[in-house]
Amino acid sequence: MLSDIDICRTTPLKPIEQIAAKAGLLADEFETHGLYKAKVSARCVKRLAEQQDGKLVLVTAITPTPLGEGKTVTTIGLAQGLQSLNQSVMACIRQPSMGPVFGVKGGAAGGGYSQVAPMDELNLHLTGDIHAVTAAHNLAAAAIDARIYHEQRAGYQAFEARTGLPALRIDPDRVVWKRVMDHNDRALRKVRVGLNDEGKTINGFEREEGFDISAASELMAILALSKNLQDMRERIGKVVLAYNLDGEPVSAEQLQVAGAMTVTLKEAIKPTLMQTLEGVPTLIHAGPFANIAHGNSSIIADEIALKLSSYVVTEAGFGSDMGLEKACNIKSSTSHKAPDCVVIVATLRGLKANSGLYDLKPGMPLPDALFQPDRAALESGFSNLKWHIDNAQKYGLPAVVAINQFPQDSAEELGQLKLWIQQLPLNVRVAISEGFAKGGKGMEAVAREVIEACDAPANFRPLYRAEQTLEEKIITVCTKGYGCGEVQFSDTAKQQLALYQTLGFGELAVCMAKTPLSISSDSSLKGAPSGFTIMVREVRLCAGAGFVYALTGNVMTMPGLPDIPAFMALDIDENGDIVGLS
């Protein structure tokens, strides 16, 4: 079988104008960026305001191996499968960060015959939205240090007299807005800025600083959760950048940088239209990670697609304990649109990995033994799939299991897994997923199950209520959402939660930052653990995005590169074609 990039390169694509017309967009509702990309205006939502929304299908997964279990392949393949059954369909996915592209996982365009194309354009820069997020974020960071410098170098009164602006009196030790970049770089997690020659202050005042990856920026979450440009502007104004010497929050609005930040994101608020290898219109928008952010593509993209098509297939990052939980408790509470159906991607290798019999490490190849028949390991890891099915139903959502087939998989084990699922005392559908090898035709069985599931009654219910305290919400997600026995809070986390409640942020949602490699916060606990303890070490405020996020375990908001990064395989030939991208 050809490599992903060779399949993509040898598949004829349609001009993006044809894809836009197929989706139902008018000529003034999109702007082309080259031959195969276009920015889409939300004007079409107003035009189609009376149009009934389509069905929203959310693709999630079991607890994955470090290389993932094929959610994007399933998302794109399912959209193609629905099209193959003559359904009107669009897909919505996140924009890939270049951190994973050059780091461990590689690209995020899908794979095989279920890809978004051109995959190299998708994985590398696209239309520049992540760079715009990075620029807007770092503009605020520069504004903070500039304000500290100008206020302190001659004193607050002199600053006010000189500028006519109120002195914000920012506490340099309580700046909470780190800088960001779209690469994995562990050396930047903790740095010092404002270094000067002795006796000088020309470079600003020295303080401790750090970098996050751009996907973890609050602006990325705001981009994904905003309903329109004005909503984004208001949210950016609410972002808390620092605290002053009296312990009061200093916002982007107070720093008078919110308008310029929004201007920087003016084009980024428009989703990018591309196509799958079989011509399904696909919107790519926003790229928050699911382990350190809320892990779902944008509300705006969903809204556009739901007005234009009968089915919209989107995905949520990592397993259902991560992206699905956040889709239900953060995204849906903002958009007021819950999924009509959940598709849970399962693989033989992923379930065997959840047996706990294999030592898997991020950045290292999966052991060959994972692809060998092993009924005992499969049966042991099956508890993980049962947990994720039950988790989807916890939110009142109909579920379909898509068993993502790999070429090495045993037909006997695939049949056995399907039988076990059918024998569960749960209302769940199941089909074998062959989107990687066969494209849409290989996904028709899953598509039929999804159509039936979308017609079944749903009784959506989030885990917690807005009026609960932040601590209660965190405990609810950990106990009801993960099955943990006890939640502990560090002294730092307790102080932060008390501060946020006092400042009036108690009604915000909570976003858990934890390992994706276990339902718990300990990546070594496989299968379906219960009764474990979760330690919340820190809670950060994202007032503009509308949530606080609680850091657990050893989750880092700036990833590092592995021993053998994916960038080592990348190059370019004499024709300008990229090689080694997957």
From Swiss-Prot:
Pathway: One-carbon metabolism; tetrahydrofolate interconversion. It is an enzyme of class 6 (ligase). One of its GO terms (biological process) is tetrahydrofolate interconversion. CDD domains: FTHFS. ATP binds at residues 65-72. Pfam families: FTHFS. GO terms for molecular function: ATP binding; formate-tetrahydrofolate ligase activity. The keyword Nucleotide-binding applies. Keywords: ATP-binding, Ligase, Nucleotide-binding, One-carbon metabolism. Its EC number is 6.3.4.3. It catalyses: (6S)-5,6,7,8-tetrahydrofolate + formate + ATP = (6R)-10-formyltetrahydrofolate + ADP + phosphate. The keyword Transmembrane helix does not apply. HAMAP family: FTHFS. Belongs to the formate--tetrahydrofolate ligase family. This is Formate--tetrahydrofolate ligase. It comes from Vibrio vulnificus (strain YJ016).
